[in-house]
């Protein structure tokens, strides 16, 4: 990353500041109410997928799901489960976006049959059944925290770049240049979690 516009902006300083900010955020992640609310929804959602009637299981957990759900309606239900005071913060928005991304990515890769994005479907149970097993939930969890990492990195990089880059043009060029590095870090975090799980299972 040192070669990305190093002559124009202090890349090393930006990277160090960004990593410090992300590290500080992760040290208190367990205290973040939005993260706890979003993850609680993922847990309840996955657990409901083990039930014969997922909607009733969700209802018993205080979550109302449309009888004929769409992927977007599930994401809306997620957002409804985050209290307004948590969702209103910048970190809250990052968390909600990460959870929505994780749900969409997991569904695209794992759902037993694809449910329409907009058109209501009665195949909720069959489509999401794989989420109810251990491996399905573990993958969703890894996706969630990987997406949280990715969004934190982008957020803090943009803040650091805004304060350091000499012009809007330089900032845009820098952000474009480091985007691939952010993606690589997020993928590394995801793969590390998979390796850790494999060793734990062994």
Where are these regions (language model features)?
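Solvent-exposed aromatic/hydrophobic patches embedded in short alpha-helical segments
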Residues: 5-10, 18, 132, 136, ...
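Extended, helix-rich scaffolding/adaptor regions
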Residues: 1-96, 102
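Short, charged/polar, low-complexity loop and linker segments
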Residues: 122-133
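Solvent-exposed flexible segments
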Residues: 79-83, 87, 98-112, 116, ...
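Eukaryotic scaffold/interaction segments
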Residues: 109-118, 122, 195-202
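Helix-boundary capping/turn motifs
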Residues: 66-74, 119-124, 154
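Membrane-interacting alpha-helical segments
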Residues: 137, 145-146, 150-202
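Non-transmembrane, amphipathic alpha-helical segments
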Residues: 84-87, 91, 95, 133-141, ...
């Amino acid at each position: 990353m040192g070669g990305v516009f190093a002559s124009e902006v202090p890349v090393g300083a930006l990277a160090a500041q960004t990593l410090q900010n992300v590290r500080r955020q992760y040290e208190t992640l367990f205290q973040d109410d939005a993260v706890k609310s979003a993850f609680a929804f993922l847990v309840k959602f996955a657990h409901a997928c083990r039930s014969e009637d997922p909607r009733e299981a969700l209802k018993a957990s205080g979550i109302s799901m449309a009888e004929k759900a769409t992927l977007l309606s599930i994401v809306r239900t997620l957002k409804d489960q985050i209290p307004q005071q948590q969702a209103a913060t910048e970190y809250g928005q990052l968390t909600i976006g990460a959870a929505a991304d994780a749900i969409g990515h997991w569904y695209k890769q794992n759902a037993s049959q694809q449910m329409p994005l907009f058109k209501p479907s009665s195949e909720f149970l069959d489509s999401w059944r794989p989420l109810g097993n251990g491996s399905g939930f573990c993958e969703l969890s890894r996706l969630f925290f990987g997406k949280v990492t990715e969004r934190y990195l982008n957020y803090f990089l943009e803040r650091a770049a805004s304060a350091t880059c000499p012009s809007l043009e330089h900032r845009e060029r820098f952000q474009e240049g480091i985007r691939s590095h952010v993606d690589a870090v997020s993928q590394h975090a995801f793969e590390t979690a998979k390796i850790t799980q494999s060793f734990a299972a062994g």
